[in-house]
Every structure is written in C-alpha cells, then in structure tokens.
Swiss-Prot record:
PANTHER family: PROTEIN PREY, MITOCHONDRIAL (PTHR33505:SF4), ZGC:162634 (PTHR33505). Coiled coil: none annotated. Belongs to the UPF0434 family. It comes from Burkholderia pseudomallei (strain 668). One of its GO terms (cellular component) is cytosol. It holds the Pfam family Trm112p. This is UPF0434 protein BURPS668_0926.
C-alpha cells in the first residue's frame, strides 16, 4: 500500500483516521467499527463494501495508516 495514499485516505462516513491491517488487507475505522477491503492494492472505500468489525478486534501492530 502506497504510504502517500494512506496519508490522505479517511473514513467516508466520519472522516476519521483509518488504520491499515496488513494481514487482512483492510483499512479499519475504529470509530464506526468498519473495515474497508483492499483489492489488488486498491482500497475500496464504499460503505456497501465495508464489513462490521467486532470491538476489540486487533489491527496489525505495524500501526495506523498515517506514515505507512
């Protein structure tokens, strides 16, 4: 995932930060408890494509999307 792209992406619902889950290939919004898939290296930032996350679900320890 391109670090420059990750720096500008935000949750389409709340405009909050996203966290990159490398293992699941998803961008996660903790505020809305949604995970947006990354397909072929392209984030799919459509609410209809997002899945609900379970509170407390760990995100890749590599950290938040910013700076990646």
């Amino acid at each position: 995932m391109d670090a420059r792209l990750l720096e500008i992406l935000v949750c389409p619902i709340c405009k909050g930060p996203l966290h990159y889950d490398r293992g699941a290939q998803e961008l996660v919004c903790h505020a809305d408890k949604l995970a947006y898939p990354i397909r072929d290296g392209i984030p799919v930032m459509l609410v209809d494509e997002a899945r609900q996350t379970v509170e407390g679900t760990p995100v890749d320890p590599a950290g938040p999307a910013q700076g990646r």
